[in-house]
């Protein structure tokens, strides 16, 4: 499945994946562009593979920052710092976001920090406005590219500022499914 998806999507700016094996497969297929691990790393040794394969990865808890601080690398990594703006699955609490950014920014193992969140209600009545407001309140003074929009935000709120961010993450829509179902 991944090889077929790659052939169909090879004009994409990047790919976001859940596991290191998928990232290795895309590199083996010849993809040299950005690869983002959406759940980040789970073990210290995962960072070695991130370095070797030039992977970007999400940082959503303190343990991942601790692992990065112990990582021995000659090539600093790009990370996506994730804020929990309402999904309540992964990410730093809004009040802890700047502190996490400061810790990451001080690490020589990190060369670029992008900022992200995930819209829990993009497919519902409440939309993205409340979560976008929380995200902006706690990140507006931080530098870095932004990634906020998921499939539901892209389809239901195409003119929203969040959709016009640097990176969007269509997921379920790539399979032809509506995020409403």
PLM region spans:
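Active-site-proximal beta-alpha core segment in soluble small-molecule metabolic enzymes
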Residues: 1-144, 158-161
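Active-site loop ensemble at the mouth of alpha/beta enzyme cores that anchors a bound cofactor
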Residues: 155-181
């Amino acid at each position: 499945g991944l090889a077929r998806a790659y052939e169909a999507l090879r004009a994409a700016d990047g790919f976001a994946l859940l596991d290191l094996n998928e990232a290795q497969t895309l590199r083996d297929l010849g993809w040299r562009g950005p690869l983002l691990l959406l759940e980040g790393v789970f073990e210290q040794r995962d960072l070695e593979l991130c370095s070797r394969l030039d992977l970007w990865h999400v940082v959503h808890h303190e343990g991942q920052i601790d692992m990065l601080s112990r990582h021995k690398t000659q090539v600093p990594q790009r990370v996506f710092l994730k804020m929990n703006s309402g999904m309540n699955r992964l990410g730093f609490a809004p009040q802890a976001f700047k502190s996490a950014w400061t810790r990451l920014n001080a690490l020589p193992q990190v060369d670029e920090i992008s900022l992200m969140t995930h819209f829990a209600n993009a497919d519902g009545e409440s939309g993205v406005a409340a979560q976008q407001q929380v995200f902006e309140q706690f990140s507006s003074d931080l530098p870095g590219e932004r990634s906020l929009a998921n499939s539901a935000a892209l389809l239901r709120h195409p003119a929203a500022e969040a959709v016009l961010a640097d990176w969007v993450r269509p997921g379920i829509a790539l399979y032809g499914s509506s995020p409403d179902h």
